[in-house]
């Protein structure tokens, strides 16, 4: 999650997102649509975090915009998606004198006039590996996409997944993507779901209150597992849903807290430590694989998948 005031990016090139594949042949051979989202194994999500940590360690301790660690992170995610049958595209831009990249992955099939997107920023700050901020969201979105492939899910709507660059500089990559879309293509996005910091070590369970239908979908999931939620306010407008919302796209998302302190009332209902930040390692060098609450990561990964399945049916 970004801390600074939004910056401005200048695009130097953009690789056009591949045209959506026609669905007729796929529909003929498609298996029956699954009735509900499958469980997302948290061990798989954590395995992606281990890879992102290794990438940061091998590249100066971070995965920041314009640094080798960011491009290596993007290459890792892209390779997994390509092998799983996604149509991927890299979108290039510049910010602060450095080249940045977005990664877009489309799952073949579904109604191209009704696109459900799930995304997260892949970059870290320069001071650390960014495993909670935002390896957690990036890894969960990746594993949800891979689960779509493993189950050969054939939704009614078209599914698109995204990993954004330079969020920490002010949602630069996601803003560049939104601005690159025609008015017609923006209107085709029926919902954008954002996942930024979903494994905080002293977690809360926060739901964006932007689009009512998306908000209700997430709340329904958490109600079903007996976990109370609160409306997200700490990061309001400070992550990659903001450019989509400004463009009129319905948005929603999940968050487990950053530098704000957990109150006594929150600790009573969620556990954890009152008077301590949700993430004491926010934007710090200690944001490593030891800075993750597995229970929060597991619940939010499953909530992510639930929303993708429910909203794309």
Regions found by a protein language model. Give the residues of each.
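Structural recognition of the beta-strand scaffold that forms the well-ordered cores
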Residues: 45-53, 89-91, 102-106, 115-119, ...
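N-terminal capping segment at the start of a domain
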Residues: 32-68, 123-124, 193, 197-200, ...
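A non-catalytic alpha/beta surface segment that caps or lines the substrate-entry region
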Residues: 50, 54-108
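His/Asp/Glu-rich mid-to-C-terminal helical/loop segments that flank catalytic regions of hydrolases
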Residues: 261-313
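Secretory targeting and sorting signals
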Residues: 1-30
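Extracytoplasmic/secreted proteins, especially bacterial periplasmic and envelope-associated proteins
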Residues: 44-47, 51, 68-88, 136-143, ...
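Alpha-helical metal-binding/catalytic segments enriched in His/Glu/Asp
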Residues: 105, 118-171, 304
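Metal-dependent peptidase/peptidase-like ectodomains
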Residues: 164-263
């Amino acid at each position: 999650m970004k801390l600074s005031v939004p910056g401005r990016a200048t695009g130097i090139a953009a690789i056009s997102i591949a045209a959506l594949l026609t669905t007729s042949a796929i529909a003929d051979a498609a298996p029956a649509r699954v009735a509900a989202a499958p469980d997302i194994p948290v061990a798989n999500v954590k395995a992606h975090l281990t890879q992102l940590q290794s990438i940061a360690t091998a590249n100066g301790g971070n995965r920041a915009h314009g640094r080798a660690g960011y491009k290596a992170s993007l290459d890792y995610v892209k390779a997994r998606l390509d092998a799983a049958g996604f149509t991927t595209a890299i979108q290039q831009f510049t910010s602060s004198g450095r080249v940045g990249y977005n990664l877009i992955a489309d799952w073949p099939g579904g109604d191209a006039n009704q696109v459900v997107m799930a995304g997260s920023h892949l970059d870290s700050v320069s001071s650390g590996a960014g495993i909670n901020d935002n390896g957690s969201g990036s890894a969960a979105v990746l594993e949800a996409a891979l689960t779509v492939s493993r189950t050969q899910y054939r939704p009614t709507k078209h599914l698109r997944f995204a990993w954004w660059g330079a969020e920490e500089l002010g949602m630069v990559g996601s803003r560049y993507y939104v601005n690159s879309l025609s008015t017609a293509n923006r209107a085709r996005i029926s919902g954008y779901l954002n996942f930024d910091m979903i494994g905080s070590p002293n977690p809360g369970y926060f739901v964006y209150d932007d689009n009512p239908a998306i908000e209700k979908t997430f709340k329904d999931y958490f109600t079903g597992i007996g976990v109370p939620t609160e409306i997200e306010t700490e990061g309001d407008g400070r992550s990659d849903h903001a450019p989509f919302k400004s463009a009129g796209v319905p948005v929603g998302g999940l968050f487990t807290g950053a530098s704000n302190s957990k109150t006594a009332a929150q600790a009573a209902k969620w556990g954890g430590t009152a008077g301590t930040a949700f993430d004491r390692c926010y934007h710090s060098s200690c944001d490593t694989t030891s800075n993750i609450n597995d229970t929060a990561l597991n619940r939010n990964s499953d909530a992510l998948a639930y929303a993708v399945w429910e909203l794309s049916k």
